[in-house]
A protein has these predicted regions:
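Short beta-strand elements at the ligand-binding edges of bilobed clamshell
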Residues: 170-195, 306-318
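C-terminal motif of bacterial Sec signal peptides marking the signal peptidase cleavage site
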Residues: 49-51
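Extracytoplasmic "Venus flytrap"
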Residues: 69-90, 114-120, 143, 216-221, ...
Length: 404
């Protein structure tokens, strides 16, 4: 073979070998790419599986619960009252959870406790915090100024508030998301007038009343007007009516001189607990021999030192031998708060509102709840936007704390 042909042959052979090597290189690179892609896919699958597993574990560890907020004065002047109401709420929650929870899914109820320390600004801040934390309803508060502010807050957050202790009709009537589990002021005066007319007030058969209107605030005026209307519709006479500008000794002596002259059998003064001592002392000094009709706030005051019978409207008489009182004392100890039964009923009201479709489990719907009637292990309840005409009221007599 001549050198030319040999060179051509060697060149072709070399090129052929080069092509084979190139093909093999390409094949190797392809496998490497496939391996890399496979590894990447495996990593993605493993990460996804781990994430799903973590999500499943988180779901298993944190089941859905119905959250209820409890917003009360746990560190201020009403600390003891608030703790008793909270224990009553806890009792109802334990009963509901033990009996299967809420809805057919059996959701448990979880309480979120907030302290407003009796300050209306804390009431608003606490309410919004509870709404953000997922509360479907809030039980509280037990300060009137705080309730007034929650009228505005609840209108924007649409999370309803159920108060176990604020009886002021004007607050509730002005709101779409405020409800009373306690009785209202208007119904309280109706109940007291019916009580007098029934003749159950055995300590005094003189069915005549002196009505006093303290010029303090709108609630006092409303209570005076409600009692006047309740008495006028019954066989009870109003023999004296007086507007009281302040609680100075001079004004109170002038007041009771007039009441003694009128020979009124009962005196109704919608005054706060801080003024009771002055009122009863002035009555004693002037020789008044009748009885008093008091607000629920008067219950904690010891009137025995002056010898007067003071009849008080209560949501539940703490010294009465009822199933509610018995169950509560058995579980927690003594009962002194008038808001215990309303606080307890509030939980069942919320449970029933959810199960009847008026209240969602995550947030309330933007509709005003109607009156709801329901039952608890300790009795029936009626709770609504205002009025609460069907509520049971205990009238107690503060001399030896005898229930009448």
């Amino acid at each position: 073979m001549d050198d030319g042909r040999k060179g051509i042959f060697m060149s072709v052979k070399k090129n052929a070998h080069s092509g084979e090597h190139a093909h093999a290189g390409y094949m190797m690179k392809g496998w490497k790419l496939r391996l890399l892609r496979l590894l990447a896919l495996l990593i993605i699958v493993c990460v996804g599986a781990a994430a799903c597993s973590k999500k499943d574990n988180d779901t298993a560890q944190e089941p859905f619960t119905v959250k209820l907020g409890v917003l009360l004065d746990f560190s201020g002047d009403k600390k003891e009252e608030s703790e008793e109401m909270y224990r009553a709420v806890s009792l109802a929650v334990d009963e509901i959870n033990a009996s299967g929870g809420v809805l057919t899914e059996g959701y448990s109820i979880e309480l979120i406790k907030k302290d407003d320390a009796g300050d209306y600004m804390n009431s608003v801040a606490g309410y919004y915090q509870l709404a953000q934390e997922g509360a479907c309803a809030v039980i509280g508060t037990n300060n009137s100024k705080g309730m007034e502010e929650l009228v505005k807050a609840s209108a924007s957050a649409n999370v309803p508030v159920i108060t176990p202790s604020v009886t002021d009709d004007s607050i509730v009537a002005a709101a779409d998301f405020i409800y009373q589990s306690c009785f209202s002021d208007k119904y309280m005066t109706e109940a007291m007038a019916s009580f007098l007319e029934s003749g159950l007030a055995a300590s005094n058969d003189n069915l005549s009343v002196a009505l006093v209107c303290p010029a303090e605030n709108e609630r006092c005026t409303a209570l005076y007007e409600d009692m006047a209307a309740a008495i006028s519709s019954r066989n009870i006479s109003t023999v004296y009516a007086h507007e009281l500008s302040d609680y100075t000794d001079e004004k109170l002596i002038e007041l009771f001189d007039g009441i003694v002259s009128s020979q009124a059998g009962y005196v109704f003064i919608p005054a706060g607990v801080d003024d009771i001592e002055k009122i009863l002392s002035a009555a004693k000094q002037c020789g008044y021999s009748g009885s008093f009709l008091g607000l629920p706030e008067w219950y904690g005051y010891d009137s025995d030192t002056h010898g007067y019978d003071v009849y008080i409207a209560m949501n539940m008489a703490a010294d009465r031998d009822t199933d509610m009182v018995g169950a509560f004392i058995k579980k927690f100890g003594a009962v002194v708060s008038d808001g215990v039964r309303p606080a307890y009923d509030s939980v069942y009201f919320i449970r029933d509102a959810i199960e009847k479709g008026y209240l969602a489990t995550a947030a309330s719907i933007a509709l005003k709840l109607p009156f709801l009637e329901g039952s608890t292990p300790l009795g029936d309840y009626v709770i609504g936007a205002y009025g609460n005409i069907e509520k049971t009221v205990d009238i107690i007599r503060k001399i030896g704390r005898a229930h009448v």
